[in-house]
């Protein structure tokens, strides 16, 4: 049983009620009040057979765990995400060797070795995120890591390209698990005013692009954080101790497992269809995600062809993008939670968009600098400065966008919201880089990157729109999950 760190304030009644209001604004009353005959929910605090937390200071509640326990879980989940994305980006230099070994002459097939892995990021969350909200986060972490390790070994022993590509997409699906449910874990562990730094650490993995060692750490150190699953276990213990078989956890639905699974699987799709907030934020972050992958895959050819870099020194081209992201991450971590705490009155999820409003629009500026200075072969440091601006600006789109979804939909639906985000975002990462060659051949580096910059500019009003009208839209476009 967890112990409460005295340095951490337990959530009081006002925080819990604020969380309930936040849920009502986004997913209607489905998670708070009795519903129709399709799924009656048991949520009567006066019912002696309803098992709930033992007040706001219950040490079993993940919000009351010690700071060490919370941070350990955060680090493990972040390492999962980092390793999953590094497996995509680190393989790119080896694609040519794979093409030689399997006698692949089609460049598109070679590119698919990376793209199919990233496509798995979109497919996996459709099942994994809903399952985590029904059966808990921990079992998904265990299962995904096992499948990932097995099929990564399978990739190493593949005897033909078809086998390799199938194994790669399965690896991508397994790797997507921590990415889609990690936001839910963060929401389980940290109250809204502390999620900025936590989500920044978790989210940086996909921007930098499960392994066996991390899997061992998961088994040893990680515990379940899903509130519903924890209450189910608490009710199960109480039934065993008291002999009262009528005890049920709070917010239990009278549904069959098949009904629960079907409802959970359609959650991400319902969020995309019925919530303009989820759709537009996912499109915006998806374009930036795909843009990063496009730059990753084209840097070597651009700097070798234009500036005569050797294959060894071409790696320096990544410094601008990487340093921009790291600096942006540090600045965001320092400012995000501090700005939220300084707000007068109750903080809104939309307050996470302040930095996105002002700093996100510099991303197109970086693309213009990079494209036109590379086109005219201006000193190589100038286009790298442009990529620094791209990395810095994109950080203030992707991370605030995902934190906004987590804050807006709460722990109960955060995993589904992140799954919806991945469903839109990952295809951009998988396929946008395939357009780089025809784009640059047709338009050149200047206009080619300018087109990408103009597309980014089209989405710059999104955070302004949601900052002003987001709360009203969350109330108007309720999604019954």
Swiss-Prot record:
Which GO cellular component terms, listed alphabetically, does the Swiss-Prot or TrEMBL entry include? plasma membrane
Q: Which GO terms describe its molecular function?
A: transmembrane transporter activity
Q: Do the record's keywords include Glycoprotein? A: yes
Record's subcellular location: Cell membrane
Key word Mitochondrion present = no
Q: In what ranges is there compositional bias, type Low complexity?
A: 1-13
Membrane spanning stretches: 72-92, 111-131, 146-166, 169-189, 201-221, 276-296, 315-335, 353-373, 380-400, 403-423, 439-459
> What top-level branch of life does the organism fall under?
Eukaryota
Q: Where is this region: Disordered?
A: 1-58
The membrane-topology field of this record reads: Multi-pass membrane protein
Q: Which residues are glycosylated?
A: 64, 106
**Keywords assigned:** Cell membrane, Glycoprotein, Membrane, Transmembrane, Transmembrane helix
Specify where it is mainly localized.
membrane
Family in the record: Belongs to the major facilitator superfamily.
Q: What does this protein do?
A: Efflux pump that might be required for efficient secretion of equisetin or other secondary metabolies produced by the equisetin gene cluster.
What is the protein name for this chain?
MFS transporter eqxG
